Amino acid sequence: MKKGKLGAIVFGLLFTSSVAGFSKDLTKDNAYQDLNVIEHLISLKYAPLPWKELLFGWDLSQQTQQARLQLVLEEKPTTNYCQKVLSNYVRSLNDYHAGITFYRTESAYIPYVLKLSEDGHVFVVDVQTSQGDIYLGDEILEVDGMGIREAIESLRFGRGSATDYSAAVRSLTSRSAAFGDAVPSGIAMLKLRRPSGLIRSTPVRWRYTPEHIGDFSLVAPLIPEHKPQLPTQSCVLFRSGVNSQSSSSSLFSSYMVPYFWEELRVQNKQRFDSNHHIGSRNGFLPTFGPILWEQDKGPYRSYIFKAKDSQGNPHRIGFLRISSYVWTDLEGLEEDHKDSPWELFGEIIDHLEKETDALIIDQTHNPGGSVFYLYSLLSMLTDHPLDTPKHRMIFTQDEVSSALHWQDLLEDVFTDEQAVAVLGETMEGYCMDMHAVASLQNFSQSVLSSWVSGDINLSKPMPLLGFAQVRPHPKHQYTKPLFMLIDEDDFSCGDLAPAILKDNGRATLIGKPTAGAGGFVFQVTFPNRSGIKGLSLTGSLAVRKDGEFIENLGVAPHIDLGFTSRDLQTSRFTDYVEAVKTIVLTSLSENAKKSEEQTSPQETPEVIRVSYPTTTSAL
């Protein structure tokens, strides 16, 4: 008998035997109903569902049935237990856009940042306490008597990608009930190896924050069984439409970030600052060489350094960090550019275009963000249009209503001046003109046509918001060789940017494949007593030029490059930096050689003289 059928029979028997008392357990009943809501949302609006079925054999009915069994089998579940069931249910999608956050305050962390090397060793790369006996460069061997690899596996979710392991290593020192984690407290014993080779064990205290909201399972028995009597005036709230039942974000307005980003960002701010945090302004890489110029203020770390190639020829190389595409949360925003950081980006690009031979973009540890802000930055890194990935989407009346709104808004726009009057000079830095108007109009028409024709469940591929190309910025353009550093902690727009640059041949990608969070994100909130703060799901499947999806696959670099144990143990990243410099300088030397060959004196072609017969005029 197949496992699925056996599970169905067992579930049926268990449910029948327990249904009489089931409704009296409000905690279990709430979780069961919330599971039904989530199942419905996945079946209705989760675009990658067929892809997950094909790639992982993920089956919605089987996974839902398994979660229901876990609820039924637990005699008196706590809200904490139910949250873990719901969290694991959505996590099983293997999607960094898909996840649940909860109204919980319980969390714990250890003030160290750990990182996994290319050869599987874990090192301390940041220390944020003056107390304790753990230092930069220490290698972690065991956690509470468990070997480091076993400890990582015990915390890992997903299929085993580099991104999954990076997330598990973060969880070694940071847990939060808001993500459905089991939160430790007290003392953790770490066994470590010093750079000198000395091995020792040391205790570390978890910085623990208790739960202040409380578990609904403790409140449920106190709720009176009789229905409260309300005065008729209370009905006014319903008639006025104040008590909305749920809300969700639209593809026209939502950020493309992983589900955990907002909670993680808040926790990082509350705990300690680190250049190893996702979205850090400076990033964790050291300077690549002697600095000739530096942008030391504002949200963009940028400088120019000098380096020599193998022939001893000097070069001026630019470095520019893009830490996040959530521009409203950029670190270091100054008053002059608080509402328009892209203007400062343009000024930096102008200087780099004038003063450098090539540019290295550091996009490591980027959480994603706004598509328009991403397009605005890319528009300044090219002098020719860049084709964008298309998206296969799921449409509901929400998208149709938004499309109608955009159609009405842009109906009488016929000039660039009118476009600016209606849309503004830029949309998060991306210039608005009639090209932008046409893009939005085309997308709106595509949505409406798809709705009318029934092409609403994973539609035909179309450009997101209609922008089939990123057009060059009219004022700021970097035209010289471009190199982008990427890693497994690049999500969403952090996947999209390298995909666009690679597919258009605009940049050489160096590093590790990106996370593979490929699509726009929609977030849903709905009334519940399971403590669900928000549900995040992927609303589209991004399709690259070659027809491949970004979801789960990520964007592979041209040149695979990770961090050696020496990089992490010394925190100087010498091997990594030297490898990147060699790649850049070799490329510049080869380009110079090709340029010389093309411009070298050619043999003068033989001149062919044509003689025309002399004609005599008739007299």
UniProtKB/Swiss-Prot annotation:
Residues 591-619 are annotated as: Disordered. One of its GO terms (biological process) is signal transduction. It comes from the Bacteria. GO terms for molecular function: endopeptidase activity; serine-type peptidase activity. Changing residue 619 to S: In strain: CWL029 and TW-183. Pfam families: PDZ_4, Peptidase_S41. GO terms for cellular component: outer membrane-bounded periplasmic space. Belongs to the chlamydial CPn_1016/CT_858/TC_0248 family. This is Protein CPn_1016/CP_0837/CPj1016/CpB1054.
